[in-house]
């Protein structure tokens, strides 16, 4: 791509390790953490204006991720191309450290959004006529947050969502077997607005 169009700006993001950042640093113009999305426009403008390489953030084990980064990431308003399906991040990060997965190292520990914030965003999507809403998280069924000094886990959150008036269905991904429970399965079975579908990583169910 660069050979055909030298002025083309190539950016790299996602679950990128420190090793990957060093490996690709000389091959792309911009490397940024997914939680730096609010700064992306500024970085691209700076890159175009100054024609300089923008240094990427490299997190070491000594550097803690700022929780404000996650809050800013949650508040990025998505632009939907599909008028029927809405996507709603409710948590980020993972605490499981499965042997095959890099997510805990690249996305950090689990952080969940406030209950009221999630419910309000779902209501906004319903007002915009979205019929299917996906709740998103690296380990979505480990969701846990406080509301009025009460701990709300994922089954309790689904119960609240099911009570919201409107013609819509809720899906969620990605789940982890460790956080599956009889309560969650019962809530899915009894809630008319929760789709009877379950997304699980196959690797995490293999003890071998």
What does each of the following model-derived ranges do?
Residues 1-143:
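Proteins enriched for Cys/Gly/acidic motifs involved in redox and nucleic-acid/cofactor modification
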Residues 11, 19, 126-208:
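Conserved SAM/AdoMet-binding glycine-rich loop
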């Amino acid at each position: 791509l660069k050979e055909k169009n030298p002025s083309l700006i190539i950016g790299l993001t996602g679950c990128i390790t420190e090793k990957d950042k060093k490996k690709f640093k000389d091959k792309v113009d911009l490397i940024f953490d997914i939680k730096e999305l609010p700064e992306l426009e500024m970085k691209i403008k700076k890159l175009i204006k100054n024609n300089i390489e923008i240094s990427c953030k490299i997190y070491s084990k000594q550097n803690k991720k700022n929780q404000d980064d996650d809050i800013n990431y949650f508040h990025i308003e998505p632009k939907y191309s599909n008028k029927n399906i809405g996507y709603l991040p409710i948590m980020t990060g993972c605490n499981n450290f499965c042997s095959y997965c890099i997510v805990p190292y690249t996305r950090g520990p689990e952080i969940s959004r406030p209950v009221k914030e999630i419910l309000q965003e779902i209501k906004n999507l319903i007002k915009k006529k979205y019929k299917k809403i996906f709740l998103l998280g690296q380990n979505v069924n480990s969701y846990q947050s406080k509301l009025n000094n009460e701990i709300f886990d994922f089954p309790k959150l689904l119960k609240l969502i099911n009570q919201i008036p409107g013609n819509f269905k809720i899906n969620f991904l990605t789940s982890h077997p460790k956080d599956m429970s009889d309560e969650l399965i019962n809530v899915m079975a009894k809630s008319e607005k929760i789709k009877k579908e379950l997304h699980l990583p196959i690797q995490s169910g293999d003890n071998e």
